[in-house]
Amino acid sequence: KNPTVVTATFGMNDSGYFEYNGDNPTAFVERQMYRVDTTFQAMQKIMKSHKDTRVIMIGGTPYDETWQNEKNKPFLGKNATIQKIIRLQREAAVKNDWAFVDFHNPVLEVNRVQQAKDPRFTLMQGDRIHPDNHGNMLMAYFFLKSQGLAGKPVAKVDIDASRRMVLANENCFVNELKVSDKGTISFTYLAKSLPYPMDTISRGWEKKHTQYEATLYAPIMEDLNQEVLRVDGLKGSYRLEIDGDSISTFSAEDLAKGINLAALTNTPQYQQAVRVMHLNEERWNIEKRFREYAWTEFYILKRKGMLFQDNIAAMDTLRANLHTNIFLAGHLDNYSKMMYPEIREAWSQQIDMLVDRMYQIAQPKVRRIELIKK
């Protein structure tokens, strides 16, 4: 692989855990920061050697020490160490002319504001570490916003029905506008983008929240998900149909203000985007296995002089070291499959197939929109 863009973040595991309950957490932090800085210097040399690769450093999400939960006592001081690590990342980004995206402070601020109302609120799962679905969605929002995508609509259509005119169309094509004597408005609509489908179902291990809940804490819909249809010059109520499917009913006043089609989950274009979303989740599930395999190789086996040995001896070594690393048990089953090159090749081909299919399905289609007077 020769990526043109690389994003890099670290800090949660590097900042330690149970050591903050030990006899001398201050000494631990000093040792750990020296180790992190030394390793990061080596990382920077590698990244700088790839002149044609754009680097984006990410300040990772916080460890939520302030969430009130009697069953999970926090490691006090851990988040301060994470913040020290993020300062190293930010300084390196400035020095090397790399981009920097901050997840840490915006997530910390949402937790602060919401916990002032309810101390049991958190964007994390029950471990104070991993963001729940709404936290992950906020991370996606902050990343996309940092790329300058805020304020760019999915599409916008502005029609004056009384004058039978398309006043404006942004990021889309509008043709064949007709206004009948009975008050029906119809036209063809080809957007250049699809709406962003935010899952309203809690998915994933230990997840209790949904992606859509993130809209309560940031203007995601307003900034990134505007597919606006505005029609002026109407009276009464109108049924919106897209490709013959009844979507909803709106008053002339609502249509004059503009309705956000991206907020309607039953439109054909939204359902088209949902298909892409689910395919991408499958791609991510497979791609995650390669990351876990790489962790096992470089964090465990490389230290044993068995990097990419991928044989029974390597497997025996991993089993013998299960007690030395709390994360290894969770990766062992994945390694037992990915140690075979045929498995890695098959899964890599699946990723390529899923990506190709995603791009095929994601192509916007010409839709027929009708507003039928009731």
Please describe what each predicted stretch is.
Residues 1-137, 141-374:
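Alpha-helical cap/lid subdomain in secreted, periplasmic
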